[in-house]
Amino acid sequence: MAIDEDKQKAISLAIKQIDKVFGKGALVRLGDKQVEKIDAISTGSLGLDLALGIGGVPKGRIIEIYGPESSGKTTLSLHIIAECQKNGGVCAFIDAEHALDVHYAKRLGVDTQNLLVSQPDTGEQALEILETITRSGGIDLVVVDSVAALTPKAEIDGDMGDQHVGLQARLMSHALRKITGVLHKMNTTLIFINQIRMKIGMMGYGSPETTTGGNALKFYASVRIDIRRIASLKQNEQHIGNRAKAKVVKNKVAPPFREAEFDIMFGEGISKEGEIIDYGVKLDIVDKSGAWLSYQDKKLGQGRENAKALLKEDKALADEITLKIKESIGSNEEIMPLPDEPLEEME
């Protein structure tokens, strides 16, 4: 139905007035504005990139990665930093926990020489630094580790045992209100690492778990990823890593509730080669005969770990199989589930 001519004139006049006050583009007709594709930063995990629906975490948005201790939250965040840097991005790490392992970050592929790092004393200081570097327009990705460690100044200055109810939640709510629009305008991705707490007095239905920092982050985050350790990886009775499951519990840019599983190897991080084998076998791109794994006419190795070692050495072959996996799954199809049974002994 056509819009009344008088209404069109009135709204056009209003748009001109708004442009004068707030700048051109403050109010636009959606039909006049080209819809831009959402850019993404790879997570370093083939399965998680597929689960997120756009090939990684979206740029210009707030992301929350949460889970129990030692589940792989920081490892995943460092992989995202490494992938961003590979494409020329500038990254910052706000280490509120004062626990960043620089040597481990380097082993995951992070360019530590060019990584901006801050170890703030208070939550207010951390969030002020975050706002300043975001408004500069020169940063592509900021990781805050973690929300639980963003301690309000009043709590630090107070005595042990003092009650500071809701201080951190108010701090987070205020910061997110200020920073969300700036992140979108500057196309900066912000990742909050968060911890899990048990709800006090929780009875009956519903999950007894919750995340720290109040409810604001749950609302402002475009993507929330729940990561858990589900098994230990062993080789010759030695623990060599963990199996992790990541579930996209909220996603504003693609369908939510998709899951991905991947190996996190001690000292190495996410095993891309392990995912290539898992998805390759599931999609019949990699052949599995007994313990032997092969691709076309080439033997990859006897056992999953040997095949992973070969793919780690032969990057060209790994890239070739990865491309075939992506083509097989397709960008518009549902994520393929991982094999029901692990290819290597886990506990």
Swiss-Prot record:
Record-given protein name: Protein RecA
GO BP: any one term: DNA recombination
Entry-linked Pfam families: RecA (PF00154), RecA_C (PF21096)
UniProt-listed PROSITE patterns: RECA_1, RECA_2, RECA_3
One GO location term (cellular component): cytosol
Primary location class: cytoplasm
Entry binding sites for ATP: 67-74
InterPro entries hit by this protein: AAA+_ATPase, DNA_recomb/repair_RecA, DNA_recomb/repair_RecA_CS, P-loop_NTPase, RecA-like_C, RecA-like_N, RecA_ATP-bd, RecA_C_sf
Coiled-coil ranges from the UniProt annotation: none
Keyword tags: ATP-binding, Cytoplasm, DNA damage, DNA recombination, DNA repair, DNA-binding, Nucleotide-binding, SOS response
NCBIfam families per the UniProt record, alphabetical: tigrfam_recA (TIGR02012)
Sequence similarity: Belongs to the RecA family.
Subcellular localization, as worded in the UniProt entry: Cytoplasm
Gene: recA
Record's function text: Can catalyze the hydrolysis of ATP in the presence of single-stranded DNA, the ATP-dependent uptake of single-stranded DNA by duplex DNA, and the ATP-dependent hybridization of homologous single-stranded DNAs. It interacts with LexA causing its activation and leading to its autocatalytic cleavage.
Keyword Ribosomal protein: no
Record-linked SMART domains: AAA
MF terms in GO: ATP binding; ATP hydrolysis activity; ATP-dependent DNA damage sensor activity; damaged DNA binding; single-stranded DNA binding
